[in-house]
């Protein structure tokens, strides 16, 4: 079924609608835009139309009869609309997804969405793009592009026994890394940096 959707795949969650050029460029270049419930209304206010709407559909003012795209009703009260949307993406072979609107507005929703990122990061290629940063969750070794002086923050989800970095100003060398603030506001030294972590971390690559 994935062949019927145009790539890139962008999911718009119902947090703060993007205003920075980076997430807006992601939205403008999307082949398929999937909205989580009420985010469809926000998208329409900005003269853009979603291709898919997913959720319990109790937040959107749209009616199914007025929507020409794919309308997916999922009333599972034990999952958020973002969880339902990502699960639907997996079931349909959409394994490469960028998420906008995941942060901002309610802080509890933002924190919950970060944990959803960690939940799905080992199942699909996924990251958030916000007005401030690209946010990833990963385990093991991974290299990311950067610019010199770019602000990089690393946050442990649980106590990491060993983490190494290459290409960051403040080096971590097989260090124990607790879920605290000691990984905030590091800096990239050049065009790329590498992190190798024994347990999942959140990585914030702030926009230059």
Q: What is the role of each PLM region?
A:
Residues 1-64:
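N-terminal beta-strand-loop-alpha-helix module at the start
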Residues 30-31, 50, 67-68, 94, ...:
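Short, well-ordered alpha-helix to beta-strand connector turns
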Residues 69-92:
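Short phosphate-binding loop-to-helix
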Residues 108-118:
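Short Gly/Thr/Asp-enriched flexible loops that form oxyanion-binding sites at enzyme active sites
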Residues 118, 123-147, 152:
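Class I SAM-dependent methyltransferase SAM-binding "motif I" and its flanking Rossmann-like core
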Residues 139-208:
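Long, charged alpha-helical interface segments
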